[in-house]
């Protein structure tokens, strides 16, 4: 009986399609020449597991699963369109304006508080910004933005944590502003939404990225505001800005190229973790120090600078801030003071999850209940 079963199986194998394939045409499946054998996304995760498990300890598993999960977005209302109508429509979706909720409904500090009161400059938030998010734990999505009656898009979808560096910059009416690494344009658009920029210089080294920035501006900003006397878009080497326009700006945003941690875990295209870009990735902190130093040199004495990344790495965050401050002190005898943003963290803790142990600045860490970020930002004042 057993012999009959074996013979039957053998006959079935002989009749199977793959049994008729000539031996010379049988081969193992090979990777396409354009498909990496070890994807950049896997390299990124391997790198993060090695470094961030040490940096964040017990917090890393929670951050890790959040990074690998769907990101949460905010809707930045376009004040140049019918802003009040758009806000009402977003409220009907049960979304909330987290900026208005935090800034205008903050609780006053108790009189017997032991913490030192922050300076008025560090308290200031850039005005007129409206950004709606869904509450913690609500994973609803915003519908795609529409073209309004004025020919401009109603709102801009972005990681709501990306708005924090702009808020921290504390723009005042009539400020001259530099966005040193402006593309793809979300923060530049937010700067213009404040209505405070007497003129704005938006720069990015990549011409393809500045083209994308221009498309964002054309979709959201009226022609008269985009006038070259008010908004100037350039593709210069940001590291040389201190030589080009030193001591010029009231406010400077330095949102540097970084490992873009969340993007690197989900996208293969143009990933900084591609093997061909290994040296570029290793040199990122050097580039970041150079860009921040240039931004500080471009700032007027008494002006303010915000440095930001979308990376969790303290090598790209706190260490870069400290390195640039030392560089300016040693080479230019320029003193820079880091602003305390503890109060800022308290303002927005209902919307974002903050890492509690940054040496300088603040870091939004991804959390499944509030899956924004990562976003690091540090505010500085150029003293001399």
Curated annotation (Swiss-Prot):
GO annotation, biological process: mitochondrial RNA catabolic process; rRNA methylation
Stored InterPro entries: MeTrfase_RsmB-F_NOP2_cat, MeTrfase_RsmB-F_NOP2_dom, RCMT, SAM-dependent_MTases_sf
Subunit structure: Heterodimer with MTERFD2/MTERF4; this interaction seems to be required for NSUN4 recruitment to the mitochondrial large ribosomal subunit.
The species this protein was found in: Bos taurus (Bovine)
Name the UniProt record assigns to this protein: 5-cytosine rRNA methyltransferase NSUN4
PANTHER family: 5-METHYLCYTOSINE RRNA METHYLTRANSFERASE NSUN4, NCL1 YEAST -RELATED NOL1/NOP2/FMU SUN DOMAIN-CONTAINING
Protein family membership: Belongs to the class I-like SAM-binding methyltransferase superfamily. RsmB/NOP family.
Record flagged with keyword rRNA-binding: yes
Residue list for modification Phosphoserine: 206
EC number: 2.1.1.-
Entry keywords, A to Z: Methyltransferase, Mitochondrion, Phosphoprotein, Ribosome biogenesis, RNA-binding, rRNA processing, rRNA-binding, S-adenosyl-L-methionine, Transferase, Transit peptide
One Pfam family of this chain: Methyltr_RsmB-F
Location in the cell: Mitochondrion
Functional note: Mitochondrial RNA cytosine C(5)-methyltransferase that methylates cytosine to 5-methylcytosine (m5C) in various RNAs, such as rRNAs, mRNAs and some long non-coding RNAs (lncRNAs). Involved in mitochondrial ribosome small subunit (SSU) maturation by catalyzing methylation of mitochondrial 12S rRNA; the function is independent of MTERFD2/MTERF4 and assembled mitochondrial ribosome large subunit (LSU). Targeted to LSU by MTERFD2/MTERF4 and probably is involved in a final step in ribosome biogenesis to ensure that SSU and LSU are assembled.
Reactions catalysed, as given in the entry: a cytidine in rRNA + S-adenosyl-L-methionine = a 5-methylcytidine in rRNA + S-adenosyl-L-homocysteine + H(+); a cytidine in mRNA + S-adenosyl-L-methionine = a 5-methylcytidine in mRNA + S-adenosyl-L-homocysteine + H(+)
Gene name of the encoded protein: NSUN4
Residues of the transit peptide: 1-25
Gene Ontology molecular function terms on file: methyltransferase activity; mRNA (cytidine-5-)-methyltransferase activity; rRNA binding
Residue numbers annotated as active site: 310
Positions bound to S-adenosyl-L-methionine: 185-187, 204, 209, 237-238, 255
Gene Ontology cellular-component annotations: mitochondrial large ribosomal subunit; mitochondrial matrix
Gene3D superfamilies, sorted: 6.20.240.40, Vaccinia Virus protein VP39
């Amino acid at each position: 009986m057993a012999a009959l079963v074996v013979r039957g199986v053998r006959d079935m194998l002989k009749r199977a399609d793959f049994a008729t394939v000539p031996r010379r045409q049988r081969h193992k499946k090979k990777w396409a020449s354009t498909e990496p054998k070890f994807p950049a996304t896997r390299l990124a995760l391997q790198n993060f597991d090695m470094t961030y498990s040490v940096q964040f300890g017990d917090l890393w598993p929670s951050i890790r699963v959040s990074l690998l999960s769907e990101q949460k977005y905010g809707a930045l209302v376009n004040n140049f369109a019918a802003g009040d109508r758009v806000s009402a429509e977003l409220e009907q979706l049960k979304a909330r304006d987290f900026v208005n909720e935090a800034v205008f409904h903050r609780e006053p500090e108790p009189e017997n508080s032991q913490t030192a009161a922050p300076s008025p400059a560090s308290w200031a938030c850039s005005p007129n910004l409206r950004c709606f998010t869904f509450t913690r734990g609500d994973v609803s999505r915003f519908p795609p933005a529409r073209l309004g009656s004025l020919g401009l898009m109603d709102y801009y979808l972005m990681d709501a944590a990306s708005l924090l560096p702009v808020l921290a910059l504390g723009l005042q009416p009539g400020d001259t502003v530099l966005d040193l690494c402006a593309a793809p344009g979300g923060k530049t658009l937010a700067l213009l939404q404040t209505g405070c920029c007497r003129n704005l210089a938006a720069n990015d080294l990549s011409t393809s990225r500045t083209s994308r920035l221009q498309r964002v501006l054309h979709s959201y900003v009226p022609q008269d505001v985009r006038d070259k006397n008010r908004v100037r878009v350039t593709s210069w080497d940001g590291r040389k800005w201190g030589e080009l326009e030193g001591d010029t700006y009231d406010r400077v945003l330095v949102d540097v190229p970084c490992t873009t941690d969340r993007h690197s875990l989900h996208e293969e295209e143009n990933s900084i973790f591609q093997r061909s870009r290994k040296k570029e990735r290793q040199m990122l902190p050097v580039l970041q120090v150079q860009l921040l130093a240039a931004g500080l040199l471009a700032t007027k004495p008494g002006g303010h600078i915000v440095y930001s990344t979308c990376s969790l790495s303290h090598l790209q965050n706190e260490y870069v801030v400290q390195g640039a401050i030392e560089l300016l002190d040693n080479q230019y005898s320029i003193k820079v003071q880091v602003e305390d943003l503890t109060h800022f963290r308290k303002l927005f803790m209902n919307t974002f999850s903050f890492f509690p142990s940054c040496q300088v600045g603040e870091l939004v860490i991804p959390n499944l209940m509030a899956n924004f970020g990562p976003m690091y930002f540090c505010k500085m004042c150029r003293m001399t």
